[in-house]
Design a protein with these regions (language model features):
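… and, occasionally, acidic/histidine-rich disordered N-termini of signaling adaptors
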Residues: 60-110
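Hydrophobic "anchor" residues on beta-strands that sit immediately upstream
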Residues: 116, 204, 268-270
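Primarily the active-site beta-strand->alpha-helix module of PP2C/PPM metal-dependent phosphatases
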Residues: 97-154, 284-285
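DG-centered beta-turn motif at the end of beta-strands
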Residues: 119-120, 185, 208-209, 270-276, ...
Length: 440
């Protein structure tokens, strides 16, 4: 039986910041959930309508609703997303490298719950972009239909994760139906908890698109930490898993992980593609160097030129993971100091995206140098020398060029603060009236 939403004064259960994870939904704690509100206040997808684009929409969609919402351009400062390209632009023709953007995000928020999705199409091209958008559509359509059309709302955290896991299968089928390519996918459901003011964050991900929580009291923690071994070196070129036709019609679910944590009102849950997360890794940002690695497949091989690692510390993989989280925190706190306000979901997206855009600027400038594109006669030896100089300059410049996306949600019951303020105002008004009456 699904519990009713209780008044704040009756809430009793509190949870800590621990993260649970496993291959299946049964490997995380079973916690009872409260009733899900159907009152929608935000539904936003991008870029360019994201899951609601014409190539993805199902011909059976209701005229007024696509994947459970009437509009996918209904954003809010508590529910927001951004998607940009960090790649260079041709200085003469204006064409962007890496186009079209193959990342996509979607968020659908109701009064006390939220569905968040992010996908990163593997490699470049139209099929990659289509795969990411199809994944969002298939997953979002399934979750919204199950929860709010068929009224089969999850009674527990395990049931919520089971729904998310099945939504991944729906995402995969949609990709195959539309003949898309491969994509990562991270699916998140923020749920009200029975007899508690806390919320459960249920998450299923495959590939290297990750989920995080920013807490004003506890900093940033990664929810999807169980999907990759933070104690081992990793090849940042390998996503670790993907849905879509990897092997015939089969996906690659090697790192698929079900995760659970609990959050408080005011915390911000955010999902990112690796264009954001990798650009906080101290090795990628050239702040540190990796430990010596004999694995030739690693993309973190130790630099060979002495000046590239002079005065830079050597970091173990786990240290790099912790540093990246702390660096994200620093960027958010600096934004709060600058604005003298608490960071909203929208501002958090803006702050992190602006940081990675600024970080990678020197890399873009190297490739956007007009001199590289002037037509002039060069011997093969001169061309080879020029190309090696560009490679060396790029290796020294911080950051990684990629598509970069983020979607964020500020946890809470939408409208609760306004209702509490209204109650206070009514009480104050009644108090004033009572004093006036006694005075007369």
């Amino acid at each position: 039986m699904i519990g009713k939403i209780l008044p704040r004064r009756q809430y009793s259960t509190k949870f800590d910041t621990e993260i649970w994870h496993g291959r299946t939904h049964t490997e995380v704690p079973l916690v009872r959930l409260a009733e899900f509100s159907e009152e929608l206040f935000a539904s936003y997808s991008g870029p360019d309508l994201g899951l609601a684009c014409e190539e993805v929409k199902n011909c059976n969609d209701n005229f007024h609703k696509v994947a459970g919402a009437q509009s996918w351009n209904k954003k809010d400062q508590r529910a927001y997303g951004l998607c940009i390209s960090l790649y260079d632009q041709h200085p003469i023709y204006g064409k962007m490298s890496g186009d079209p953007i193959a990342d996509a995000f979607a968020i659908c928020c109701r009064k006390n719950n939220a569905i968040m999705l992010i996908a990163d199409g593997v490699n470049w091209g139209e099929k990659s972009r289509l795969a990411a958008r199809c994944a969002l559509y298939g997953s979002m359509e399934y979750i919204n239909r199950k929860l709010f059309q068929e009224k089969t709302q999850p009674a527990s955290t395990q049931e919520a994760l089971e729904i998310l896991r099945t939504s991944m299968d729906a995402a995969h089928r949609t990709i195959l139906k539309k003949e898309g390519g491969l994509t990562t996918l991270c699916v998140c459901l923020i749920c009200p908890v029975y007899n508690s003011a806390d919320f459960a964050v249920c998450c299923v991900n495959v590939g290297d698109s990750f989920a995080y929580v920013f807490s004003k009291n506890n900093g940033i923690r990664e929810i999807t930490v169980g999907s990759h071994d933070v104690a081992s070196e990793r090849d940042i070129r390998d996503a670790g898993g993907a849905i879509g036709p990897v092997d015939g019609e089969n996906p690659e679910l090697q790192n698929l992980t079900c995760s659970l944590t609990f959050v408080n009102k005011g915390d911000v849950v955010f999902l990112t593609t690796d264009g954001i997360s990798d650009n906080f890794d101290p090795v990628v940002t050239k702040v540190a160097i990796p430990r010596k690695n004999t694995d030739n497949n690693s993309n973190d091989a130790l630099p060979t030129t002495p000046d590239t690692f002079e005065d830079k510390p050597m970091m173990e993989p786990q240290e790099r993971h912790i540093y990246a989280l702390k660096e994200m925190e620093r960027i958010i706190h600096e934004h709060e100091l600058l604005t003298e306000e608490t960071c909203s979901a929208q501002e958090l997206c803006g702050a992190l995206v602006q940081h990675v855009l600024t970080l990678t600027d020197s890399k873009r400038k190297i490739l956007e140098n007009p001199e590289l594109y002037r037509k002039k006669k060069m011997t093969s030896k001169e061309r080879k020398r020029r190309d090696s100089q560009i490679v060396e300059q790029m290796s020294k410049a911080p950051g990684k060029l990629d598509h970069a996306s983020i979607v964020a949600y500020e946890v809470g019951i939408c409208g609760e603060d306004e209702e509490e303020e209204e109650i206070v105002l009514i009480k104050e008004s009644n108090s004033v009236k009572s004093k006036k009456k006694n005075h007369h």
